[in-house]
């Protein structure tokens, strides 16, 4: 059983107004909550924030006034992407030059091999928060 994009958008709309969300049917249960990653001031254009959230390395980027959160480990070389070069909405792996689109997680060039998971982001009381509905680009 999979969740379609419309339903995920609905959940995120509800969740954006609350701290947590629970949805149950006879077949499945969805429990989502916002998790604090960092303060908004810790993320600057061209200088992303990197942190471990619930055992996952997460990179938070500020691009054109919007925040984006991606898995922070390069799928090819396992380097922290947030330590790479950030320009024009793209991040380059510091080891082998794989390039990813920060807004979508899409691998644009190099040996990355796959797209990155991205995570819904909100700013709540000056704190960057994410939730783990993993979104990947097909």
Region spans (language model):
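Short cysteine/histidine-rich metal-coordination sites, predominantly Zn2+-binding motifs
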Residues: 88-94, 107-116
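Short helix-to-coil "ATP-lid" hinge immediately C-terminal to the conserved N-box Asn in the Bergerat
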Residues: 99
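N-terminal pre-ligand scaffold of iron-sulfur
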Residues: 19-88, 102, 115-138
């Amino acid at each position: 059983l999979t969740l379609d994009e419309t339903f995920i958008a609905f959940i995120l709309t509800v969740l954006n107004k609350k701290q947590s969300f629970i949805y149950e049917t006879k077949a499945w249960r969805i429990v989502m909550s916002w998790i604090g990653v960092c303060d908004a001031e810790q993320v600057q254009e061209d200088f992303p924030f990197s942190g471990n959230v619930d055992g996952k390395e997460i990179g938070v980027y500020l691009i054109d006034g919007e925040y984006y959160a991606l898995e922070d480990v390069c799928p090819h070389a396992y380097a922290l992407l947030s330590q790479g070069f950030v320009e024009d909405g793209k991040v380059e792996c510091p080891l082998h030059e794989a390039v990813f689109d920060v807004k979508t997680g899409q691998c644009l060039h190099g040996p990355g091999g796959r797209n990155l998971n991205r995570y819904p982001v909100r700013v709540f009381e000056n704190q960057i928060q994410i939730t783990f509905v993993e979104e990947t680009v097909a």
